[in-house]
Regions:
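The feature marks short, hydrophobic/small-residue-biased sequence motifs that occur predominantly
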Residues: 107-174, 180-202, 259, 276-279
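Short, flexible turn/loop "capping" segments at secondary-structure junctions
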Residues: 33, 114, 288-291
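Hydrophobic alpha-helical segments typical of transmembrane helices
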Residues: 14, 28, 53, 87-88, ...
Length: 316
């Protein structure tokens, strides 16, 4: 009883002490409330960003599952294709948990243009299957084309980052670009400085930025440079890229591909390394046996089912 009375007395004294100085107490309570709100908001924001990044990686880059020949993962050599492909495809077709899958060739190579070259990972894909599994086709920059929309040989899809590396992007100040900036709310006093550069083209972003820095103050560059770049950027669509890689016997081979589309996603590293060509074109150039597949990307109805599907596939 004495303990209960003491506890009640302490609580009573504490409550009175809180409101003895109302201003101080309100400041402390407000600080605690704001701190909690800021913490909850930050955690929610970070969780949302992580979820978006994971979703983007699954939908554009990795899918829910990938099936490979174990030796291909260890050595990355062309001859290590998936064994018993027909049986595996039959199994995937019968599993209700499997939403879609895409069979691919995959190999390392070099992409070359007259302006530059870069190492790339080349995927030979079936466009119809690829659309069912990944969303790259939804991320093609509008003015650059489509995702294998034309029924022609030797088309290639590349990322925006790789297009920059290969000098397939230029910047041109046109009347249309100036009008676009005006509509976007760029002040006339800023736009007037661009008048002397109308119809001038810059071969790369470095040259373009250098010229902009000569014309504008640091503050104007901070506020408007991204708008300048977006309004004046254009792509050398339909340009040719020469891909070189090893064929099935280890000899260097290659072919010239015409750009069918340029994709843009949140992962610039992926954009700079991964290119897509038609399965039949890559099979022909590398002299791989018909039906060869290095990986099968699988999209499930529910990612939680991945362990069960893996067990079923391995048991077969």
């Amino acid at each position: 009883m004495y303990f209960l009375n003491s506890k009640a007395m302490i609580l009573s004294i504490a409550w009175k002490n809180i409101w003895r100085n109302k201003t101080r107490s309100m400041v402390i309570l407000s600080a605690i409330a704001l701190g909690l709100m800021a913490g909850i908001f930050s955690i929610a924001l970070m969780a949302g960003m992580v979820d978006d990044r994971v979703r983007g990686a699954i939908e554009n880059e990795v899918s829910h599952m990938k099936i490979h020949n174990q030796k291909f993962l260890e050595n990355d050599e062309l001859q290590f294709t998936i064994n018993q492909r027909e049986k595996l495809i039959e199994t995937l077709d019968t599993l209700q948990q499997v939403k879609a899958f895409s069979e691919r060739l995959r190999m390392n190579g070099m992409a070359n243009t007259s302006g530059n070259n870069s190492g790339v990972i080349i995927y030979g894909v079936h466009p119809g299957q690829e659309r069912e599994v990944f969303n790259i086709h939804e991320n093609i920059i509008e003015e650059t084309g489509g995702f294998f929309d034309e029924d022609t040989r030797n088309q290639i899809i590349i990322g925006e980052k790789l297009a920059n590396t290969l000098n397939l992007v230029h910047y041109e100040i046109t009347e249309k670009a100036v009008d676009t900036l005006r509509i976007a709310g760029v002040p006339e006093e800023v736009l007037s400085k661009l008048d002397t550069l109308v119809d001038q083209r810059f071969r790369n972003e470095e040259d373009f930025r250098e010229k902009m820095e000569q014309l504008f103050t640091d503050g104007q560059m901070r506020n408007y440079y991204s708008s300048f770049k977006q309004a004046t950027k254009s792509f050398r669509t339909r340009s040719r890229i020469v891909l070189t890689m090893q064929d099935n016997e280890g000899y260097i081979t290659g072919g010239a591909f015409r750009i069918a589309g340029i994709y843009s996603i949140t992962n610039s590293a992926f954009e700079g390394m991964h290119v897509f060509v038609n399965y039949d074109d890559l099979l022909r150039i590398t002299n791989m046996p018909q039906g060869s597949v290095h990986e099968i990307a699988v999209m499930l109805e529910d990612i939680e089912q991945s362990d069960n599907i893996s067990e079923i596939i391995e048991s077969d």
